[in-house]
C-alpha cells in the first residue's frame, strides 16, 4: 500500500511538492478530514514500518491496508488512550474506510505510493472503531454476578406511652 512513505510528486520538472503543500491541496479539495488527521496518518505509517522492522528484522518497503490499520490502531491507543474516539471525531474520522480515503488522497497527491493490488476496499470494514478504541477502556464486567444481599426487614418500632 504505502511504498516509499514520503514520495513527492513532480508538478514541474524542477519543482517537487512537499508534504505541507500536499496537505494544503488535499484539505482544500476534500474538507472531510482535518489537516492534523493526515499528519497523524503519516506518523502512524512511520510507527507501523518501525514495528514491522522490529518483527521482520529488515526495512519494510510496502505496508498493506490492513497492516497500516493495525499499526494505526496501536499508535492511536498509545498516543490518545481513551480519548481516541474524541480526537478522531474532531478530525472527521469515523471508520477504517475514512482512513482508506485519506490514504488514497495522499496517494493521489504523490505523497504515498501503492501497488497494483492496493485498493480502497483494503480499508473497508477492517475493524469496528468502538470495538478497538472504546472497548479496551470499558470497565470489565464481573465474571459472576453475586446474589444481592438481602437486608433483614425492619423491626416495628416500639410504641411509647
Identify the role of each PLM range:
Residues 2, 6, 11-161:
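Non-transmembrane, aqueous-exposed alpha-helical and coiled segments at domain scale
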Amino acid at each position: 500500500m504505502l511504498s516509499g512513505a514520503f514520495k513527492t510528486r513532480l508538478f514541474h520538472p524542477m519543482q517537487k511538492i512537499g508534504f505541507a503543500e500536499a496537505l494544503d491541496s488535499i484539505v482544500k479539495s476534500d474538507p472531510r478530514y482535518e489537516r492534523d488527521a493526515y499528519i497523524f496518518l503519516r506518523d502512524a505509517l512511520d510507527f507501523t514500518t518501525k514495528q514491522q522492522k522490529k518483527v521482520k528484522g529488515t526495512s519494510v518497503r510496502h505496508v498493506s491496508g490492513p497492516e497500516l490499520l493495525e499499526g494505526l490502531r496501536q499508535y492511536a491507543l498509545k498516543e490518545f488512550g481513551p480519548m481516541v474516539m474524541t480526537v478522531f471525531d474532531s478530525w472527521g474520522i469515523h471508520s477504517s474506510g475514512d482512513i482508506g480515503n485519506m490514504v488514497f488522497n495522499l496517494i493521489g497527491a504523490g505523497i504515498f505510493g501503492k501497488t497494483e493490488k492496493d485498493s480502497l476496499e483494503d480499508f473497508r470494514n477492517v475493524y469496528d472503531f468502538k470495538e478497538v478504541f472504546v472497548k479496551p477502556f470499558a470497565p470489565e464486567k464481573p465474571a459472576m454476578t453475586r446474589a444481592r444481599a438481602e437486608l433483614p426487614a425492619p423491626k416495628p418500632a416500639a410504641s411509647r406511652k
